Amino acid sequence: DETHEAELTALNDLRDGLDTISVERKGDEILKLFAAPSLEYSICLMEKAKINSKIFNTCNHASLSSLIKLEKRLDIAPCAIRRLAAYTGDNLKSQLRFSKKQAKAHQILRQEATNRKDAAELSYRYNKNLALDAILVRSSLQNIEPSKNIFSQIKKGSVAKFPIKPFDLAEYFSGPRLGETLAYLEQKWIESDFTLNKEMLLATIK
């Protein structure tokens, strides 16, 4: 209709002027866009106007669409970095001058989307918000349903405290071997659903 034609015309003008806009300004506008409730409609228009190809090297509209549906169904507020992780694997720091923190979060979400850590482990290793985002991005990229107990698992991981400290192992190991054993025991504890206590864990290496 006429409204869509006018929007496309405006977007075509924007595309032609992108080369004169600073990278930082592009990054700011992309963050605002990806946090907006009407993102999917805007992305469709941008793709029609071929704007996306001037900003991103890779993009996955199907994954983004899947993520937005998940957000609505689970009543989760939009998050620009989460949505960008579902949409593109590009290096956002070099391409759009995102901050180190933003680019790192995006990188972690992309990495964890292909790993097998569950929600509890992600929450333990990072934090509750990043764990939720990682599970949602993984679900959207792999087209799978998140587990029904995702929120309780995230809560469990966020309060879990690993019972072993380096000095607990100093009697048996030193140097790199100590670090390796500590990491081994930590993973064993995580795989027990955080149930093994200090004595049980130490018994496995004596």
Predicted regions mapped to residue ranges:
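Alpha-helix N-cap/helix-initiation sites
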Residues: H4-E5, V23, P78, G175-G179, ...
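Short, surface-exposed helix-loop/turn micro-motifs enriched in polar/charged residues
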Residues: E2-T3, L18, S22, F98, ...
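Short, well-structured alpha-helical segments
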Residues: E5-L8, I43, N60, Q107, ...
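Intrinsically disordered or highly flexible coil/loop and linker segments, enriched in small
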Residues: E2-H4, L39-I43, I51-I55, A160, ...
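Non-catalytic interface/linker regions that flank or bridge core catalytic/transmembrane domains
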Residues: D1-R15
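Charged substrate- and nucleic-acid-binding regions of tRNA-handling and nucleotidyl-transfer enzymes
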Residues: V137-K206
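Conserved, hydrophobic alpha-helical core segments of structured domains
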Residues: N12-P146
